Amino acid sequence: MKTEIDILSDREVEIWDYAESQNGTMDFVTEKLAEEGIFDQYRNIHKSYLELYFRIDDEGAKLEILKRLIFLNWYAQVEPSCYTGIEDLDNATVSESYSILNQYLIDGKIDAEFKWMLSFYSSWDYTILPFSENKLEALTAFVKGVDTSILSCPKNQLPKGVMDNRGQMGIYWISMSVEKKIM
C-alpha cells in the first residue's frame, strides 16, 4: 500500500513527465501549463507536503518531507517552470518550511544527505536568503558559511536506487549523477 508521501511523489513525477512532453517555445509551454492548471496542481503538492509534515509523527518521514520541500523551494527559483511544472509556490509554505529547517539546524537534526543537498542549494543563496536573513539565524549562517567553490554533492558515490521514488528531487539528483554507475 502506498503512503501519502509516495502518492505525492507519484503526482510530482506525473506533472514533470507532462511538462517534459510539451513542445514549443518556453513562453508557449509556460502559458499552456498555466492555463491547464499545472502550476496550481504543483502548488497544492507543495502545500500538501507541509500539511503532511505536521500530521505525522515519524521523524524519518518528516526529514524526507522537509528535504523535498526545501528542494522544491530552490528548484522553483532556479529552473524554468516550463520544464518542471513548478511556478509561484505559496510564500507562506516556503517560509514555514525554511523556519522548520532553521530549527532542524539548531537542533542538529539534519543528516549527511540533507547537509550536502542544502550546501548545494546554498550556492544559489538568492533562493534562500530573502526568506532567512534577519529572521532565521541558523539557516542564514549555514548558507553564508558554504564554500561555493567546492562541489558539495557526491558524484557517483551513492547506492544505485537511493534517489528512486523521491519526486522531482530524486529525478534531479539522478540527473546530477550522485548514484553509482552499474558496470
Predicted feature locations:
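Residue at a conserved register position within TPR or TPR-like alpha-solenoid repeats
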Residues: N73, P80, S122-D125, L129
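A structural signal for the main folded, soluble domain(s) of proteins
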Residues: A112, A138-A141
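Structural signature of tandem alpha-helical TPR/SEL1-like repeats
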Residues: S132-N134
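N-terminal alpha-helical interaction modules that lie
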Residues: M1-I106, V143-M183
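Start-of-helix signal in alpha-solenoid helical-repeat scaffolds, especially tetratricopeptide repeats
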Residues: L63, A112, W116-S119
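A short, structured loop/turn motif at beta-sheet edges
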Residues: I106-A112
